[in-house]
């Protein structure tokens, strides 16, 4: 089996255009900004709202790579990060109102372990597979 590409190799191929003040375009209509300071899901969403946005929602494989690569560019490591999705009344939905149409769950997920995992993280240690976690965890995040 061939070794998977390194984050540096993967991210070198992802072209991102700056739109100023640490914001980068994730596609032609949306820009994103990474925040390293870990916050709970609600604290992170509140911060994004103060930036006139929401936690980032991912809709395509390319957007997942852009989000992962921003993490890599800022930290030179991949880690877990809040995304703008959560569970309400048993349904997973994006908090910006867009369709939850990109669901690359890690194996065995979502599992709602302990009955209290209502928020969604992208685990970029596993190249962006989604996992449901408790909303009280503190993670870095990205606003869009």
From Swiss-Prot:
Expressed by the venom gland. Glycosylated with a carbohydrate of 383 Da. It is found in: Secreted. One of its GO terms (cellular component) is extracellular region. It holds the Pfam family Lectin_C. Keywords: Disulfide bond, Hemagglutinin, Lectin, Secreted. SUPFAM superfamilies: C-type lectin-like. It comes from the Eukaryota. Residues 27-144 form the C-type lectin domain. PROSITE patterns: C_TYPE_LECTIN_1, C_TYPE_LECTIN_2. GO terms for molecular function: carbohydrate binding. InterPro entries: C-type_lectin-like, C-type_lectin-like/link_sf, C-type_lectin/snaclec_domain, C-type_lectin_CS, CTDL_fold. Disulfide bonds join 48-143, 119-135. PANTHER family: MANNOSE, PHOSPHOLIPASE, LECTIN RECEPTOR RELATED. Others isoforms (Sp-CL 1-5) with similar chromatographic elution profiles, molecular masses and N-terminal sequences have been found in this venom. The role of this hemagglutinin in the venom is unknown, because it is masked by the high venom hemolytic activity. Lectin with specificity to galactose. Induces hemagglutination. Belongs to the true venom lectin family. This is C-type isolectin Sp-CL4. The lineage of its organism: Eukaryota, Metazoa, Chordata, Craniata, Vertebrata.
